Amino acid sequence: MLHLETPHLVLELVDPHSPPYDLLTVFNSNPDFLEATRGEALSAFDLPDVKTFIQTATSHAYNRCLAIRLRETGALIGAVVVVAPHTGQPYPWLGLLILDSAWQGRGLGAEAVQAIEEGLTQEGWTEVHLCVLEASSRARAFWERQGYTVYGERRDREGRACWLLRKSLVMGEPQHG
């Protein structure tokens, strides 16, 4: 899953050495994401934050950070991190999906998720998991609309409360609740 295409999007590996300016714009365009991750509404990400994100998201062979670009113009509008498999677990995780707020609500996030799920299915994965910060109820609602179900709660590395969600990638298999 190094390159995925949809009718409106191209998802491709992020070059860990490329300047992070476009991703900085994407991150800072999302006040809900800022508040959920920073714990305060007005705290913005800076270039070192985004460089650290890219370094972390590309540092292991099983981590894939994909840029989400508009197919028509090539403009960067988001990113997604796929960890397949997640350390010590027999299934992949989506570590982050973020779209520039100007492009939200147009079905592009769902289109990106569908492409990622199809890519994971082609690689032989049968389910995918993710974690949503409890401070981000909009994100949980988005994932539930994509067919993900909550199966638990935990704290992340920073001690923030999270919902655990999963989805079967096998057609006709019931979702676990």
Language model feature labels by segment:
Residues 107:
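Conserved G/P- and acidic residue-centered "switch" motifs that form tight phosphate/ATP-binding loops
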Residues 122-131:
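Conserved GNAT acetyl-CoA-binding A-motif
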Residues 130-140, 156-161:
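Conserved beta-strand-loop-alpha-helix junction that forms the acyl-donor binding cleft
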Residues 144-153:
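Conserved acetyl-CoA-binding loop of GNAT-fold acetyltransferases
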Residues 110:
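Residues forming the Rossmann-fold NAD(P)(H) cofactor-binding site
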